[in-house]
């Protein structure tokens, strides 16, 4: 990612002289939406809403975005994709771009982008739904995997997208009481945001040690999110410190506690593995282009008992990383690996959908495969896997062949040569 943005800075600094940058700006339009670049809507039978939930007044609390089945309320507005300018600043820090420049660029290109989920729309009650906890990648945050989360919600899942506070997110925050707040002020008006930005490696610091420590915290945050949603479903009242019109009481008896899974991308893929090893209530897991460096030796030794699906891109993986995956999955028919042909590491987050061909290819946000086809393969394989291992009574088994790596633009296992090197 760092080398990618070295290239980015060179391009932007030469923007007045470069026909490429002028064309890229025209291609993207104002906010990306004017040229029809949109995050895809869910293809399932259910309308989707989303809302944010934060508990506690310290970094140890929980913060997540819940995607859920909603009543079909056409009057409700779609949700801003990136909700605060501080996320632009965090992305700039992560990508080694001056904050002032990065904030302006992100605001120009994606500032008006929305995700196709209705903000705080009324929850659709009536049955118990399976729950999926989602973990974001390094430098990401809770909102930028909305294409995957919305599709899962449209197919009947509750999806809790965690925002991690281990300093691996580009930016996140917690709410603390204002120093000058009055005792009679309500829960939301008497608080202010305390921002936590991405922490870079310090000089001489070993990355594996830092990432292993972070993945432990990330797994605990996924388990906290699970506990929080189950607490709400049990009817216990939870205080949301964010100002929201959403009525959490409507989620009472909404979770099928026997059908819970965990899913994540990159660093979030490692988080999936750690979460499975620590929490048996996660019945299965899906790791998207997992980055295995953070996974501890103890996890390999104790192994992961639950079913696990690795969905990899063609261009990101390397032999040592794949061999670590195979160490977890060897001789277990409930652990699968597939690779999406023509895909790149950024084929899973939303950035691939809000960039045009020039920006997308130059910054490796797009692969050779159409982004919509890549995400469909990912989502369909995931749904088929979840149906089997959560014992769902749906029709997702029509995509079972994808889990075995059979179909257009998908292969079983990996494209990486694993032959021993001399």
Swiss-Prot record:
Its EC number is 3.1.1.47. SUPFAM superfamilies: alpha/beta-Hydrolases. Plasma. GO terms for cellular component: extracellular region. GO terms for biological process: lipid catabolic process. It catalyses: a 1-O-alkyl-2-acetyl-sn-glycero-3-phosphocholine + H2O = a 1-O-alkyl-sn-glycero-3-phosphocholine + acetate + H(+). This is Platelet-activating factor acetylhydrolase. It comes from Gallus gallus.
